[in-house]
């Protein structure tokens, strides 16, 4: 590749070339890699819309996942892990070709045999595919309650809390359709936010999406209303004819439709009562909620109840979900009701940062070892092994040349205790353990160090 010293070199690398990191689920795609030359060295930057997690950020990230698993375990949900790429047809049929996701946001590729795949742009359709393929819907498994954690890929404009590769916490339930379950599902979301201590200033907005002839009548009325506008965005113009409900979810013109016909005016008495009863039960459980008649979801498969947990101050959605009672059958399975929700981990991390909330436990070492001689190196490794076998968190720095550097490393790593291993301590078998909090020093034989750290006599 020819280079110009005064210009940045940009090279497009094939979409098929990628690297996968198991934790925290990062698939870095060389979709638009920038390579530039500086002082004779080439540097490759991460793709636009992705991020690297390390140190405190990765600890907080893992803590969010752990708290999610903790709450889901209390609600008796089991984890499911599906592939990161699936057949393109799964999302065309499942999500709907009128959705932004399918029409313009999917990362698509064709394998060597001409099969069309996509990096998964959402988590529900793959879960339904797994349910059907593995026959998890048999009667003794129902209701089937599961959750997933993993990366999602959408080609959209990166912005605060929104990436082209982002990560979702998702909840799915199959084989049950009732007001009580809807309330429990929403209370699950509330429990997770409470576990993270970010449930303040949050309200649940909800609506009920009608179906059948009622929906057809409503869509005709909505089209009449929308045809009064002569300045709708190009996406809305397309959606009016493909899936008119999606116009209400438009990110550009959505705020224009406050006076749009209300769906409940066309709903059956049964559907109205279900929405109102769900609302009343949430209030009785202390979950703040309101009915938003213009709330629709960005995915075509939703039916019945839809909801969003929104921050009152920022108007940002934190959790979004609802019912999709036709999706299993549409993807080739039995007629089975389903519901769930999803949460973006990046959005959660942004909220935690804004509110200065830490969810990870304080990261401290039980012991930091300072080796001051060649003979001390072996004893240090011996003590490290014994302590770690006893489930103690211990460390050293093999580059240490003096006490000052050792104490500096121990302080940086927030070690509770420090032990120095030098020639004198080796010869006498007396080792001084310093408690960093109290400042007290305890003299011990080598064989007693681990027992002391474990609180044993």
Curated annotation (Swiss-Prot):
Keyword list (alphabetical) reads:
Aminoacyl-tRNA synthetase, ATP-binding, Cytoplasm, Ligase, Nucleotide-binding, Protein biosynthesis
Alphabetical GO CC annotations of the entry are: cytoplasm
List the InterPro entries hit by this protein, alphabetically: aa-tRNA-synth_II, aa-tRNA-synth_II/BPL/LPL, Anticodon-bd, Anticodon-bd_dom_sf, His-tRNA-ligase, HisRS-like_core, HisRS/HisZ
Catalytic activity, reaction form: tRNA(His) + L-histidine + ATP = L-histidyl-tRNA(His) + AMP + diphosphate + H(+)
Gene3D superfamilies in the record: Anticodon-binding domain, Bira Bifunctional Protein, Domain 2
In Pfam terms, one family for this protein is HGTP_anticodon
UniProt-annotated location(s): Cytoplasm
Tell me which Gene Ontology terms the entry assigns under biological process.
histidyl-tRNA aminoacylation
Keyword Endoplasmic reticulum recorded? no
Sequence similarity: Belongs to the class-II aminoacyl-tRNA synthetase family.
How does this chain assemble? Homodimer.
- Which NCBIfam families does the record associate with it? hisS (TIGR00442)
Q: What is this protein called?
A: Histidine--tRNA ligase
This protein's species is Mesoplasma florum (strain ATCC 33453 / NBRC 100688 / NCTC 11704 / L1) (Acholeplasma florum)
């Amino acid at each position: 590749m020819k280079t110009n010293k005064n210009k940045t070199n940009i090279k497009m690398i094939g979409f098929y070339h990628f690297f996968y990191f198991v934790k925290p689920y990062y698939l870095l795609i060389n979709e638009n890699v920038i390579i530039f030359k500086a002082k004779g060295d080439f540097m490759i930057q991460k793709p636009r819309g992705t991020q690297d997690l390390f140190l405190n950020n990765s600890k907080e990230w893992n803590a969010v996942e752990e708290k999610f698993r903790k709450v889901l375990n209390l609600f008796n949900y089991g984890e499911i892990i599906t592939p990161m790429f699936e057949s393109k047809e799964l999302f065309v049929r499942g999500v709907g070709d009128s959705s932004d996701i399918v029409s313009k946001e999917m990362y698509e590729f064709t394998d060597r045999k001409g099969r069309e795949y996509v990096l998964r742009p959402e988590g529900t359709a793959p879960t339904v595919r797994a349910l059907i393929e593995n026959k998890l819907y048999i009667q003794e498994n129902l209701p089937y309650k599961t959750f997933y954690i993993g990366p999602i890929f959408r080609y959209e404009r990166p912005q605060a809390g929104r990436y082209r590769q982002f990560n979702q916490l998702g909840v799915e339930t199959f084989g049950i359709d009732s007001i009580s379950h809807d309330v429990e599902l929403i209370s699950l979301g509330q429990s997770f936010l409470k576990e993270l201590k970010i449930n303040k200033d949050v309200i649940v907005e909800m609506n009920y999406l009608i179906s059948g002839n009622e929906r057809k009548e409503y869509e005709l009325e909505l089209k009449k209303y929308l045809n009064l506008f002569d300045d709708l965005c190009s996406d809305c113009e397309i959606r009016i004819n493909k899936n008119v409900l999606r116009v209400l979810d438009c990110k550009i013109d959505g705020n224009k439709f406050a006076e749009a016909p209300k769906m409940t005016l066309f709903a059956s008495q049964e559907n109205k009562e279900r929405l109102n009863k769900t609302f009343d039960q949430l209030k009785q459980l202390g979950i703040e909620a309101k009915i938003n008649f213009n709330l629709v979801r960005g995915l075509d498969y939703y039916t019945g109840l839809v909801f969003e947990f929104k921050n009152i101050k920022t108007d940002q959605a934190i959790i979004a979900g609802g019912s999709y009672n036709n999706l299993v059958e549409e993807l080739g399975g039995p007629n089975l009701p389903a519901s769930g929700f999803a949460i973006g981990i990046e959005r959660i991390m942004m909220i935690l940062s804004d509110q200065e909330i830490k969810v990870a436990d304080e990261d401290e070492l039980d012991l930091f070892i300072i080796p001051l001689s060649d003979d001390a190196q072996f004893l240090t490794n011996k003590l490290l092994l014994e302590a770690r076998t006893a489930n103690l968190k211990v460390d050293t720095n093999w580059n240490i040349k003096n006490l000052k550097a050792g104490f500096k490393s121990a302080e940086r790593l927030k070690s509770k205790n420090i032990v120095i291993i030098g020639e004198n301590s080796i010869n006498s078998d007396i080792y001084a353990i310093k408690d960093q909090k109290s400042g007290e020093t305890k003299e011990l034989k080598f064989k007693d160090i681990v027992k002391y750290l474990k609180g044993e006599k």
